[in-house]
Swiss-Prot record:
Name used for this protein in its record: N-acetyl-S-alkylcysteine sulfoxide monooxygenase
The organism of origin for this protein: Bacillus subtilis (strain 168)
Gene Ontology molecular function: monooxygenase activity; oxidoreductase activity, acting on paired donors, with incorporation or reduction of molecular oxygen
Short name of any one Pfam family annotated for the protein: Bac_luciferase
EC number in record: 1.14.14.-
Expression triggers: Induced when methionine is the sulfur source, but not by sulfate.
Summary of subunit composition and partner proteins: Homodimer.
Amino acid sequence: MTRADFIQFGAMIHGVGGTTDGWRHPDVDPSASTNIEFYMKKAQTAEKGLFSFIFIADGLFISEKSIPHFLNRFEPITILSALASVTKNIGLVGTFSTSFTEPFTISRQLMSLDHISGGRAGWNLVTSPQEGAARNHSKSNLPEHTERYEIAQEHLDVVRGLWNSWEHDAFIHNKKTGQFFDQAKLHRLNHKGKYFQVEGPLNIGRSKQGEPVVFQAGSSETGRQFAAKNADAIFTHSNSLEETKAFYADVKSRAADEGRDPSSVRIFPGISPIVADTEEEAEKKYREFAELIPIENAVTYLARFFDDYDLSVYPLDEPFPDIGDVGKNAFQSTTDRIKREAKARNLTLREVAQEMAFPRTLFIGTPERVASLIETWFNAEAADGFIVGSDIPGTLDAFVEKVIPILQERGLYRQDYRGGTLRENLGLGIPQHQSVLHSSHH
């Protein structure tokens, strides 16, 4: 298997979005996070754009300070099951935690979704970093970082073991002889580990794609190692081309060290493209959104990087002030970059504060510009594909209608779906049943 021939995309559907004040935009439906129509429309738009999958993020704890989307939203397995019935080819990926679920339940839910959708299910495996999540699951505290990954490894091994309970042709349904299944093709797990004791077998068989695709998003040392060993696909951030390229090379070489074919691991940085017919229009879309964050909050946020220096004494709409070396000890590289950018682009204090509070994406501008950036990242081996966020209304539609055709013209993007399963559309093979892999040891 070689590197994917085509760039691939996943669409993150995130209700009212990932910011504190985005819901106040006139075009945003403030109930989007629990509006099934909103999710269906987004999923269908992504499918029209031949995206490989849609992605539903999740969390297990909120407080009064959480962003609006977190306060009131769908749980992934139910919304993905609903979306399965209004889509045909697009993958359905959801976040589930290994710290607060039973492997039997997760393996069953995901395999059910895989059957409902005809082989389109994916699991974004997380270990849940919040103390509050422990308190919502009858646990007094959260296991520490390394232990959470130990639990995750055993949890995933059990889930994959359960997915191998039945061989793909175990159910023979012979009405004449009355034989419903072939007993030799049923395997009981009998797992007894440090964290889980699971007998099995699972009460649902293999799916059209064998088993769901496993995604992971660890960027810590432990997280990268875990992802390189276990994941079919990996999510990451896209702060800069150099940084993302380094992450890509690092994870692929770790996968090779684990004895895996590095090209069987797909890497997806997250981007939030803002596309418009002119640079000015794209900039205006960005500003409209950035301006929703109260300017006082944005200036206070910016001041954090400058030792909480009082920036409110400076006029907002004049060039960014010269404040000397304030903040040098705490965030030197960040403050240097802020000052450099402000000078080079002649930004006002207001603009600098807005860009820090609602980061300005690299992927902004005309369709040609955004398509070329995507091409550059793909060719530079920083990505096999991208997770596309679309907090700003209309941005997913614009991307599908204007950027996708350019990528198709350049021979970088498919003209049609390869098949109906998520594995086919990611260019990944169907995993062999474990009985085949282990038969040489019997």
